[in-house]
């Protein structure tokens, strides 16, 4: 993912960080054949764009971009943070390793995306319970994610962009 962060500190200092995603190096427009209809998003129905054949821009490997979130959050932490990266990721590591009771809203979201999550072995292993949607209150444990966060905490953003985590993602794709 990606995003934009605006920071205002108590002393009046601050700034912003734009950490948008980037298309993969081998991505090109011909990979995304347009159809003759629009995709309309959001309750306001004000956002639309041309539909892409087979949802190639939204589902599967051709929808994956280079995430900017790790770089953006680590940059923000370096500029304005008061703790080190390993301390910042520690609570998330604990939750990922020990698990937590799956909230109702997340269980519903996973059930809604069951067919899509079933298509890919990795998403099925992480987000489904023996091929079925996880139910509210299920113990949601993500050991591999905990290991990734530990590595990011030790190494920093370079782990995502050229390090072990980035290499693992590139190899899978």
Regions found by a protein language model. Give the residues of each.
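Noncatalytic scaffold domains of N-terminal-nucleophile
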Residues: 1-173
């Amino acid at each position: 993912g990606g995003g934009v962060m605006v920071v205002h500190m108590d002393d009046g200092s601050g700034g912003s960080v734009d950490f948008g995603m980037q298309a993969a190096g081998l991505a090109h427009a011909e990979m995304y054949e347009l159809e003759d209809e629009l995709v309309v998003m959001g309750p306001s129905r004000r956002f639309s764009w041309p539909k892409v054949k087979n949802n190639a821009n939204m589902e599967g490997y051709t929808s994956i971009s280079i995430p900017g979130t790790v770089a953006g959050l680590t940059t923000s932490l370096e500029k304005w943070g008061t703790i080190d990266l390993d301390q910042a990721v520690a609570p998330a590591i604990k939750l990922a390793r020990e698990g937590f009771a799956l909230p109702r809203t997340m269980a519903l979201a996973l059930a809604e995306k069951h067919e899509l999550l079933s298509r890919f072995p990795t998403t099925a292993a992480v987000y489904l319970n023996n091929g079925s949607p996880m139910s509210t209150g299920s113990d949601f444990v993500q050991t591999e994610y905990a290991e990734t966060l530990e590595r990011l905490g030790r190494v920093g953003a370079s782990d995502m962009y050229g390090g072990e985590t980035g290499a693992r993602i590139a190899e899978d794709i």
